[in-house]
Structures are given as C-alpha cells and as structure tokens.
C-alpha cells in the first residue's frame, strides 16, 4: 500500500526528457531487499537518488546500480549509530530531499531474544534499529525535507517487523 501512496503521483517528467533538476529522494537501507528495490525504481524514473548503506563497500549490487544510473549516489549510514546519522546530516547540509524512505528493520537471532538466553546488548541494538532509528534519521534530515518540494516521509519495513506474519519468532521480549 505504501508503494502506491508514494508512487501514486508519477514524476512530472518522462525518463527520456531533459529536466533541469529531477526530484531528490533518500532511501535508507538501500543495499538490499526493499530498500534496494525502492532505490532502483526511483533511479529508473530519473530521480536524484541518495541511497544509504551501513557498509557501502559490501553493497556490490547497489554499486552496480549506481554505475548504470549516474543520478544515484551511495552514502554511508549506520542507523544504529547517532554519530553516523549526524555525519550524514552534515554531508547533506543544504541538499533538499523531496522524499525520505525510511527502510529499516532487523530481526536478529531467535536464541538472543528468549528469556534465559537474552543478549541484552544485541536486543538493545534490535530495539534501537526497529523502534528508534527511523525517527532519529527523520529528525536529523528534517531541514532537508522542509527544503524539498514534496516533503514526504515514508516508513517501510519487511516481514521482519510483523511477528504475526513471521510465526517462527518466539520473542515475548518484544
């Protein structure tokens, strides 16, 4: 449904048209999964795509996409690290962002989430990523979003965020 909301109004230009300034979009977690698909779709439509990855050097598929879409650039972002979020904001100072796609989420190992074998440090990381990181990224990039024309924020997640849809999880700790 969210895909339909963000893409309901297609860009006002065709991919073959010359546009003075295509819209800018930032996609977090663009190195794989849904984030990669979103970054790819926006790049194919001619948008200026800022695609973030926790480990850009390991994001071979995303780097290949950037090689075929010159309007796609890759930025380092570790959404679990406040300093990394702040550094991204500093690097993007003055850069308008029309759409921010917050694509974050991690599941972790089942045995780290059970009473009796809880790894508190890892669980803290899961909670920080799943519950707080999108908010922190949005907060830091708010000036960029306000400077954009569309001013849209999309929050997406995969099945890892739904325990009902992922029955193998035995994580009463959530």
Regions found by a protein language model. Name each.
Residues 24-27, 100-101:
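Conserved hydrophobic beta-strands of the Rossmann-like cofactor-binding core
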Residues 45-61:
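Conserved glycine-rich Rossmann-like NAD(P)H-binding loop of the short-chain dehydrogenase/reductase
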Residues 66-83:
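Rossmann-fold cofactor-recognition segment
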Residues 79-95:
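Conserved Rossmann-fold cofactor-binding substructure of NAD(P)-dependent oxidoreductases
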Residues 106-107, 114-127, 146-174:
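Catalytic loop of short-chain dehydrogenase/reductase
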Residues 138-139:
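A short, exposed helix-loop element centered on a Lys and neighboring polar residues
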